């Protein structure tokens, strides 16, 4: 019987052999952790997409379209040195209020969580530490859940009496998260995180790849700190030099991200830094190779 991963790789090889060769060179299909997590997650995604009258081929096509779009964005970034958009209003008009474009973008990102090594390294980092951070009877909040991979992993490692809440401003993103998480006890909130009262507190907050989508990431980080209980922990990630159609705030390196976290009042407890290409630090900085930064922080 063909596994979902085998099917996905076979489909990509048939439709984009060059990209398939790149994946085969960077992904270890003998890694039991990778295979088990990917198979489990893609099974949930497949169930969701089939209930919409589609097949997993649709999601893979979205992923390949996303990859092609990112090549164009990268070329423009290297030419201009900046992201294509610098305002939320502009991105909202072009992407978030354009259902067709936002749909393919979100579904493509589902597959990138496992097919891009820098993304999976970040997830593995989260998985290795989240179990130790979840307190019995605690409250977990995820901001910008999207594909729901992280809140699903947190639930898998938590005790039964941890409550889970997911907040997102996008109805499309919320629909995707709800579909993938069907049958699980989560409080879904379609609202802006800034609408949360400062008195509402959480023991753990996850905010993966959100601050690059706003014009003022410092204000968002301060809001996250405000919502944490004393001694609470947050997991926050963001990329540097990673041009995509909906990224607004450009970080040039990991140090800029660290400094902003500290400015927001956080203490960095643990971190991971992963480049998108297997090159030296010198070359990565020279050619502005995309970097993924993630950290567990405390107030």
PLM feature segments, named:
Residues 104, 117-136:
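Conserved alpha-helix/loop element of class I SAM-dependent methyltransferases that forms part
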Residues 125-131, 138-239:
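Conserved SAM-binding loop
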């Amino acid at each position: 019987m063909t596994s979902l991963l085998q099917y996905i790789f076979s489909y990509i090889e048939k439709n984009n052999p060059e990209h398939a060769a790149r994946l085969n060179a960077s992904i270890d299909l003998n890694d039991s952790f990778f295979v088990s997590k990917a198979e489990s997650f893609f099974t949930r995604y497949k169930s969701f997409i089939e209930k919409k009258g589609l097949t997993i081929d649709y999601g893979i096509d979205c992923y390949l379209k996303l990859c092609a779009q990112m090549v164009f964005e990268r070329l423009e970034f290297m030419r201009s040195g900046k992201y294509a958009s610098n305002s939320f209003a502009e991105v909202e008009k072009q992407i978030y209020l354009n259902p067709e474009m936002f749909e393919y973008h979100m579904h493509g990102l589902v597959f990138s969580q496992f097919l891009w090594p820098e993304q999976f390294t970040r997830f593995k980092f989260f998985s290795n530490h989240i179990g130790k951070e979840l307190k019995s009877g605690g409250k977990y909040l995820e901001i910008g859940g999207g594909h729901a991979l992280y809140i699903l992993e947190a639930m898998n490692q938590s005790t039964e009496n941890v409550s889970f809440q997911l907040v997102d401003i996008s109805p499309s993103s919320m629909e995707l998260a709800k579909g993938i998480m069907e049958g699980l006890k989560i409080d879904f909130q379609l609202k802006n995180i800034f609408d949360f009262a400062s008195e509402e507190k959480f023991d753990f907050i996850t905010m993966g790849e959100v601050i690059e989508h706003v014009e003022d990431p410092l204000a968002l980080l301060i809001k996250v700190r405000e919502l944490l209980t004393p001694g609470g922990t947050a997991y926050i990630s963001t990329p540097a030099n990673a041009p995509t159609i909906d990224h607004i705030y450009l970080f040039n390196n990991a140090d800029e991200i660290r400094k902003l976290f500290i400015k927001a009042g956080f203490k960095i407890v643990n971190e991971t830094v992963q480049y998108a290409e297997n090159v030296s630090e010198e070359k990565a900085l020279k050619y502005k190779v995309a970097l993924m930064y993630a950290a567990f922080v405390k107030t």
